[in-house]
């Protein structure tokens, strides 16, 4: 078995000798560092396997949309049946076919375990995995936290987007923002063996036009040098009246390889400007959820804006020390500058839909460094094969958030059915400075023990995670005491897999995730007490079925996440609160009867508050989450016209509660999408035409949102693209 690097690229064998498993060069983790999963040959008996292709993508299901392998953190890439987790990898073909403009578009299209609101104009990507919020700032870039764009990431520079469901601190270390529902890894494009030059022109209603150029080449006597460039520009009006968006991206990927070493570098620069952004609405207690207005209504002033700029870079290296030992290391840095002027809080205050508005602005600057070093080795002890991994991760963020607010223009009195807003106002009553300096360091070890050529596999692992956190608050020039936290903890994992046959695997795991601890506030009897990183604990069992062109994953899970809790009797603050999510998932993807491709599934998640400061909410369902999601995407390649593929998709979400007492809720919805794809040849050049009409019935519906309780779902949106290969 060969474990691959997260980028799915293998070094080319030039001499005819067996290719050694790649290993990253040990990069000193001094001031900053950064990391990625790497590949190594699992056992020396495989040493005669010569790999002669570099940069070739893994085999894929669903007509090339779903990779048969995905990155599993420090364990490297694993094939579908060898992965003891519920994981999925989306290829660049899926990204293109989905007309995706961010990561949420990719991972939520047909996966029922992932929930996104569907609203437009939010300043950041927002999604939930297995019922828990996952912060876009916790997305990994080639295995490193903190390198990807901070608020939104254009997906055109990625070869693959991997999603691993459930907490995974052993595999990746503690996410900077404490996401525990799952982890996402963005794998950048590399130059392939064959040169690539393609241009994609895009249109999205009402009048947003754009282009994407993708160029890749290899150079040198043995094609040891690789260059891949991606450039993106989009600008124009969105499908919501009064809302527009402009996005730019330039990314460059470089690599060099020989028989035993690999060096890769990535650089990118991206910007986004949204005019008429939308943070959503809250609703006053006792007010019924009103009927939604027209689907293209902008519930925010058109003069409001979000403006962000991201830049990042990383270098990684791998070196084969022997046939069975690989060393790896990576280092990266990124910076985000964000500026916003938008209503911070908009509340529905009566049954007629009247809005109460508080304005505010935000300026944010975030600088991040990240890294990883490690060693992977394979060896045998009698009949047992070992795959041993040691690694250390590092992450630091220096952030300054400068919000303003509390300007309440009461004379406006907008209404959701007639949202008339006053002129732009930047005179605010309150000014804040919220600096944060956070450093996270971890050391992890994992040993995968295999018997009978991998039929029986058990992975035992442990990670030590430390965090050094300091934050401050300045309000209208008045400084408040600094909050300091310096704590550490251990997170174990036990994972097992049994390959029943060449097409069936059973797996189970116990894993933990970490969220930053806090200090007890001024209202607590134990004010100032610091708490270590808090552990979210998962137990999971599942079955995987590989029917060559069609795959299924069935899983059962329970996740318990601690929440802040202040004892009503003693007034002592702790993390004694708890949310418990229990769920069952069925996901499938593949080709059926040659002409049909199916992707989708069903997920039921019972998210219950089991202990809370307000005891009346115990036993209630967690808010802003449908307990049932069902998704199905069908593609039909017409037998009478093989160049044409017709596409249909349906997404169902059940009722969602938006208040802790479960008295206010949003009704269940089913959204339908239609599309088509046509392969043509023009002037001897391949041209692929893609058409999508999302929310084809133009359903007006409420959905939940990251910052507030509810927001309008996206209206009917038409997207068209044409990709020409030169």
From Swiss-Prot:
CDD domains (UniProt xref): ligand_gated_channel
Keyword annotations of the record: Cell outer membrane, Ion transport, Iron, Iron transport, Membrane, Plasmid, Receptor, Signal, TonB box, Transmembrane, Transmembrane beta strand, Transport
SUPFAM superfamilies cross-referenced by the UniProt entry: Porins
Impact after mutating residue 166 to A: 9-fold decrease in Vmax. 5-fold increase in Km for ferric-anguibactin
Motif (TonB C-terminal box): 709-726
Gene Ontology CC terms: cell outer membrane
Motif TonB box, residue numbers: 49-56
Effect of residue 585 to Q: Almost no change in Vmax. Does not affect Km for ferric-anguibactin
UniProt membrane topology term: Multi-pass membrane protein
Pfam family of the protein (one): TonB_dep_Rec_b-barrel
Entries under Gene3D superfamilies matching the protein: TonB-dependent receptor, beta-barrel domain, TonB-dependent receptor, plug domain
Key word Coiled coil present: no
Signal peptide annotation: 1-35
Keyword Iron found: yes
UniProt-listed InterPro entries: Plug_dom (IPR012910), Plug_dom_sf (IPR037066), TonB-dep_rcpt-like (IPR039426), TonB-dep_rcpt_b-brl (IPR000531), TonB_box_CS (IPR010916), TonB_rcpt_b-brl_sf (IPR036942), TonB_rcpt_CS (IPR010917), TonB_sidphr_rcpt (IPR010105)
Disruption phenotype: Mutants are unable to grow under iron-limiting conditions in the presence of anguibactin.
Subcellular location: Cell outer membrane
Residue span(s) of domain TBDR plug: 79-189
GO molecular function: siderophore uptake transmembrane transporter activity; signaling receptor activity
Induction statement: Induced by iron-limiting conditions.
Ranges of residues in domain TBDR beta-barrel: 194-726
Impact when changing residue 463 to A/E: Loss of activity
Subunit: Part of an iron transport system composed of the outer membrane receptor FatA, the periplasmic binding protein FatB and the inner membrane proteins FatC and FatD. Energy for the transport is provided by the TonB2 system.
Role this protein plays: Involved in the uptake of iron in complex with the siderophore anguibactin. Binds and transports ferric-anguibactin from the cell surface to the periplasm.
Name the record gives this protein: Ferric-anguibactin receptor FatA
Originating organism: Vibrio anguillarum (strain ATCC 68554 / 775)
